[in-house]
């Protein structure tokens, strides 16, 4: 007699499970996201496959010395986009499982379709679509002017059927669009549920490891911009990248959040055109599109994204508030960091903005999370408050502590060299980041305290 399916209550946002229903998830604090699921007992064969691991079949595993394992590097192959290769750590590793997410309309399917059409000229590829019909994909490829003669297409949502066909076709690269619509027959829940996403992703990852085929899975995102589905989805894959971009901007940023074969937080920049996505080889140029007129409240900083320095402009507007509670708005920067810096500026800089509205924005839609932007943000706000522009050939970076000290940041020499390459001739940096060999024609101001930076600003 077959066993009755088990019941579980699982959060659709984070995947946490509970013995009974409750209104709010204790893990992610989301409301009304816990649903009941019936989990059927998995067949014995499937259980044995899960226990065998990713690297081999059950019964043939053996203990090996770490020194005896081959150190031969896996040969990567290029995607045809240098920016995409940069984010992946130098190209696609055979047998890797990659997850790419992004908002609807960001260009995930377009980027992967362009990539596979290029690679199909020299290797065997397979594009599996579960959301769009084959005719819709063909129409998009025709509109973008892509070569379609050698690209293999498949419209299927059953993971078992997809892997069976992949075993026959033996592609080197396979795209699954998207993981949220795929399903397994053994999992008794609807496609897109936590159990289905978890099991299908684990099945595809195991298939990639044992067959040596690279698999790229497209994932949806939640309303706050994070990848939808259980957190275990990001744990079982090798690389997780996010394609981001505002709806009113033609630029897209591709950022790695997890990468077992390269640097994390690596950034690639693309531009959406009528012919699809085109890579931007010099991102600093698009983020520094400053006009001829010098305005107050503008400063240029150097941020470090993955393995590359990037020049970004910060805009600040400080204006007298007509309300009892002045507004503090930060776009592209952390709101809490802005509040801390305003307090430091009042305490150690002698400038108070308690009666001022403060608006700050990072040009180009870039999101800056590192603290090296502190000093540039403070000087931009002081510039707007005094209505006195900073010189256009000035670049600023440095972390500001709670005691008003200017702390050094990593890769100071590389940041200064990047600024000099783009024509900047003056820089305000932490004293510990002043290089021993200053680039020719560049003047460096090393500061130890916030008051020193304000004094340099007064003398410019």
Residue ranges and their predicted role:
Residues 103, 130:
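P-loop (Walker A) phosphate-binding loop of NTP-binding proteins
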Residues 125-129:
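Conserved RecA-like ASCE P-loop NTPase motor core of nucleic-acid helicases/translocases
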Residues 134:
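Divalent metal-dependent catalytic cores for phosphoryl transfer on phosphate-bearing substrates
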Residues 2-13, 17-86, 93-99, 106-117, ...:
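Peripheral, non-AAA+ core regions of ATP-driven protein-machinery
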């Amino acid at each position: 007699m077959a066993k009755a399916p088990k019941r579980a209550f699982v959060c659709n946002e984070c995947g946490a499970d509970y013995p009974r229903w409750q209104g709010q998830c204790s893990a992610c604090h989301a409301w009304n996201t816990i649903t009941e699921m019936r989990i059927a007992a998995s067949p014995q064969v499937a259980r044995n496959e899960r226990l065998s691991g990713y690297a081999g079949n059950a019964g043939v595993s053996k203990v090996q010395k770490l020194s005896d394992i081959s150190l031969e590097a896996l040969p990567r192959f290029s995607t045809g986009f240098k920016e995409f290769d940069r984010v992946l750590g130098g190209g696609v590793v055979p047998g890797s499982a990659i997850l790419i997410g992004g908002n609807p309309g960001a260009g995930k399917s377009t980027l992967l379709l362009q990539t596979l059409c290029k690679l199909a000229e020299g290797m065997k590829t397979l594009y599996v679509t579960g959301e769009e019909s084959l005719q819709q994909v063909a129409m998009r490829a025709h509109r973008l002017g892509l070569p379609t003669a050698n690209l293999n297409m498949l419209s299927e949502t059953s993971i078992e059927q997809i892997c069976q066909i992949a075993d026959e076709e033996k592609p080197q690269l396979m795209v699954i669009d998207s993981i949220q619509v795929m399903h397994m027959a053994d999992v008794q829940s609807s496609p897109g549920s936590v159990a289905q996403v978890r099991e299908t992703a684990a099945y595809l990852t195991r298939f990639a490891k044992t067959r040596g085929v690279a698999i790229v899975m497209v994932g949806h995102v939640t309303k706050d911009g994070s990848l939808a589905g259980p957190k275990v989805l990001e744990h079982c894959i090798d690389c997780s990248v996010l394609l981001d971009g505002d709806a009113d901007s033609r630029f897209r940023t591709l950022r790695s959040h997890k990468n077992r074969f390269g640097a994390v937080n690596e950034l690639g920049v693309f531009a959406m055109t009528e012919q699809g996505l085109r890579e931007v080889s010099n991102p600093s140029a698009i983020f520094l599109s400053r006009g001829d007129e010098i305005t107050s409240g503008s400063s240029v900083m150097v941020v470090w994204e993955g393995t590359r320095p990037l020049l970004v402009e910060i805009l600040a507007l400080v204006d007298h508030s007509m309300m009892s509670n002045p507004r503090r708005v930060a776009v592209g920067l952390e709101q809490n960091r802005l509040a801390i810096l305003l307090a430091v500026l009042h305490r150690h800089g002698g400038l108070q903005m308690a009666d001022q509205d403060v608006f700050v924005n990072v040009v180009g839609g870039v999101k800056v999370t590192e603290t090296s932007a502190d000093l540039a943000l403070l000087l931009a706000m002081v510039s707007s408050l005094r209505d006195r522009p900073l010189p256009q050939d000035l670049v600023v970076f440095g972390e500001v502590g709670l005691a008003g000290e200017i702390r050094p940041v990593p890769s100071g020499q590389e940041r200064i060299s990047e600024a000099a390459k783009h024509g900047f001739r003056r820089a305000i940096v932490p004293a510990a980041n002043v290089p021993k060999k200053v680039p020719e024609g560049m003047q460096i101001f090393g500061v130890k305290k916030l008051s020193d930076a304000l004094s340099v600003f007064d003398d410019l």
